[in-house]
Amino acid sequence: MTKNLYLGVMSGTSLDGVDLCVMDFAKNPPKLTACGFTPMPEDLRTDLSHLLKSRETSLQKLGEIDHRLGLLYAESIKRFLAEHHLSASDIQAIGCHGQTVWHSPNGNFPFTMQIGDMNLVAAHTGITTIADFRRKDMAVGGQGAPLVPAFHEGIFASQERLTVVLNIGGISNISVLTPQQPTIGYDVSVGNALMDSWIELHQAKRYDKNAEWAKTGKLIPTLLDSLLDEPFFKLPAPKSTGRELFNLEWLAKKSANLTAYRPEDVQRTLAEFTAQSVVNELKTLESEKQCLLLVCGGGARNPLLMQRFSELLPKWQVATTDEYGLDIDYVEAAAFAWLAYQRVHNLTSNLPSVTGAKQPVSLGVIYPK
């Protein structure tokens, strides 16, 4: 059977590395046929983390990181293809998100910035590469995010019940798939970003594996209440956010004396904050019938978060996308393969009901091989 393969590449706000997957669009629905992961080199991760947290850099430093990311993507792709016995000629196009370093959709001059030189990706892989997906949506009045709900709609929508796909990366975003209604999707809260930053600060670990550290802590009710009292949660959808809001500086401002608490108690409270802030939004959506919550992203591997979702959402069936045929770690990468397919065929790929754009458009800039 003829194959129609597109490669999706994603590196998210967690800075852990690069997700890659191949989708076969000869299938309906498209099928994930291969997936892989390349860890972020420590020196590049350190420089990116500093850039995201300090918000200050030089043009030279920004340009150098842009180049280094481009090389990382290209080398990751070549190694991935070799491991899966694929050649460049097997792949129709690459859809590469790039690395978000700033996302500010609501200012006087709205903009979003993803870096990683895609000229290098196209040149080094010999494959047409498509990137810069967000700015076209912003150019027609949208938030530039989230872009994945259109893909979720095609894969997970049901005519029988409300389905919400919750992606927990650095930030938590949802796709709301309601029968006979336009799909909507938006960022709802922080995801892993605060928990990751806090354990990195105190234990020099990238993340709290299996919530082991958080489980040793006790909830701090006053801190939790302060965190939940965030104006972002009162904004109407569609809306988007990022590390420029939810960071350790924000956390410090939410507490009169953060150092008075045991670090593990803060970690437990951050986990509860992530769970409750997401649940508060989901409860505004639930119907009388049982609803389905499909969780993907790194947060789906956090047993404490999954436990709290089940406890706090009695009307919902809580599952991971693994149980519905799509690996939890590669949903976003798969979405960018889909976005590349849409761009190659000049098909629209944003949903105005999701991003707030004035019109549907085909997203992405093409970098020929």
From Swiss-Prot:
Pathway: Amino-sugar metabolism; 1,6-anhydro-N-acetylmuramate degradation; Cell wall biogenesis; peptidoglycan recycling. Its EC number is 2.7.1.170. Keywords: ATP-binding, Carbohydrate metabolism, Kinase, Nucleotide-binding, Transferase. Pfam families: AnmK. The keyword Transferase applies. GO terms for molecular function: ATP binding; kinase activity; phosphotransferase activity, alcohol group as acceptor. It is an enzyme of class 2 (transferase). NCBIfam families: PRK09585.1-3. Catalyzes the specific phosphorylation of 1,6-anhydro-N-acetylmuramic acid (anhMurNAc) with the simultaneous cleavage of the 1,6-anhydro ring, generating MurNAc-6-P. Is required for the utilization of anhMurNAc either imported from the medium or derived from its own cell wall murein, and thus plays a role in cell wall recycling. HAMAP family: AnhMurNAc_kinase. Belongs to the anhydro-N-acetylmuramic acid kinase family. This is Anhydro-N-acetylmuramic acid kinase. It comes from Actinobacillus pleuropneumoniae serotype 7 (strain AP76). The gene is anmK.
